């Protein structure tokens, strides 16, 4: 037992000097949060411009970490029909934000790929409009909870 304790104590200084793979640099995290907030604000403004708020409230997914955010954004983007008017730029920006977060997540998280909801081919306009409203609410929630992106 004494040998194990001595070995642990001898290796402790070495383990403190070696950086953990995937250890988060505070500057990188703050830069990521700032960029996500900026992109989310732009997306909310663009959605509001093309699809004004009609006072309806939609339930949104929870912001639980970067993996859940990527999955939600990609899923909402899949639900928005390409044929729905005025959404091509919005879809591009959602894809850009999801791609940015996914790239950051791959470099800083050890988790699996996020699971994306399947695309639906019925009631395209209704599903697209609801997905747009939900992604708007989700982005507002994301801006308030941007600190949770540090989690995987």
UniProtKB/Swiss-Prot annotation:
- InterPro entries reported in the protein's UniProt record: 4_helix_cytokine-like_core
Let me know which tissues express this protein, per UniProt.
Expressed mostly in the liver.
This protein's species is Takifugu rubripes
- Source species taxonomy: Eukaryota, Metazoa, Chordata, Craniata, Vertebrata
Q: Which UniProt keywords apply?
A: Disulfide bond, Obesity, Secreted, Signal
Q: Which Gene3D superfamilies match?
A: 1.20.1250.10
Please give the positions of the paired cysteines in each disulfide bond: 109-152
Role: May function as part of a signaling pathway that acts to regulate the size of the body fat depot.
Task: List localization entries.
Answer: Secreted
Q: Which gene encodes it?
A: lep
Signal peptide (residue range): 1-26
Domain of life, per UniProt, equals Eukaryota
What is stated as this protein's family in its record? Belongs to the leptin family.
Q: Which terms in the GO cellular component ontology are assigned?
A: extracellular region
Protein known as: Leptin
Principal localization reads: secreted
């Amino acid at each position: 037992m004494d040998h194990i304790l001595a070995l642990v104590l001898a290796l402790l200084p070495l383990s403190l000097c070696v950086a953990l793979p995937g250890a988060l640099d505070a500057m990188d995290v703050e830069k990521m949060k700032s960029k996500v907030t900026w992109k989310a604000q732009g997306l909310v403004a663009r959605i509001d411009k093309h699809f004004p708020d009609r006072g309806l409230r939609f339930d949104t997914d929870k912001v639980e970490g970067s993996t859940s955010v990527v999955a939600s954004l990609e899923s909402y983007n899949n639900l928005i029909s390409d044929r729905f008017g005025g959404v091509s730029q919005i879809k591009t920006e959602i894809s850009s934000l999801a791609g940015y977060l996914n790239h950051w997540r791959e470099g800083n998280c050890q988790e699996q790929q996020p699971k994306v909801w399947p695309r639906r081919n019925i009631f395209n306009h209704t599903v697209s409009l609801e997905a747009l409203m939900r992604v708007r609410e989700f982005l507002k929630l994301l801006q308030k909870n941007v600190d949770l992106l540090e989690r995987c």
